[in-house]
């Protein structure tokens, strides 16, 4: 959207799959973060959008042909752009911390979470919903949790931290949009959330996360 000159962003539901629907909580959580961006003049939800200049809903027909950014660029007929697209004030309370998250989808069981937690447990701050946090602590032991109200809170926490570690979840995309240092637990079956910039590291590339954590 930034590459196309910005403007008013209209969000809608592209299908009726419950976990994919944006209306309600997901939209209300995302809206404050979007409204902070200088290239977005407004944000709204519409069930049946009209008078749209660029419609990106059809990008899924390119599934399997590249990253999500590349697929969306194909749908819009433009070259992929991975320039920093998020700008927010960092939460300075997270200085020295490493923000992590792990959603229930897009996992890689070879990723050394236990070793990472054992090494930096006192610096880890988990961001995620109750079920994700509960599952994470049952698997890897107790870590601190940072409670957030919306995506703006999450992005500010990530921006204020030393690093983000997580899988292909919405917090990853916030870290990538900020060009924040990160390590991704890349899903082998669906490695479509790759954004190449200095400081972004992907497990699928054969990296050793333990060597990257300072």
Segments predicted by a language model, with ranges:
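Catalytic machinery of carbohydrate-active enzymes
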Residues: 1-214
């Amino acid at each position: 959207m930034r590459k196309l000159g910005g403007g008013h962003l209209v969000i809608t539901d592209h299908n009726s799959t419950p976990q994919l629907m944006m209306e309600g909580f997901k939209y209300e959580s995302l809206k404050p973060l979007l409204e902070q961006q200088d290239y977005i003049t407004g944000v709204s939800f519409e069930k049946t959008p009209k008078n749209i200049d660029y419609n990106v809903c059809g990008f899924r027909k390119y599934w399997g042909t590249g990253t999500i950014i590349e697929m969306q660029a194909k749908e819009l007929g433009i070259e992929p752009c991975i320039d920093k697209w998020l700008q927010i004030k960092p939460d300075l309370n997270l200085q020295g911390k490493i923000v992590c998250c792990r959603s229930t989808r897009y996992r890689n069981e070879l990723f050394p979470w236990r070793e990472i937690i054992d090494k930096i447990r006192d610096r880890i701050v988990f961001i995620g919903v109750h079920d994700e946090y509960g599952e994470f602590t049952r698997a890897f032991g107790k870590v601190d949790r940072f409670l957030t109200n919306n995506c703006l809170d999450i992005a500010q926490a990530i921006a204020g931290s030393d690093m983000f570690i997580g899988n292909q979840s919405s917090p990853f995309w916030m870290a990538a949009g900020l060009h924040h240092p990160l390590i991704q637990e890349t899903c082998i079956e669906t490695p479509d959330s790759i954004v190449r910039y200095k400081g972004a590291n992907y497990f699928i590339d054969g990296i050793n996360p333990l060597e990257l954590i300072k």
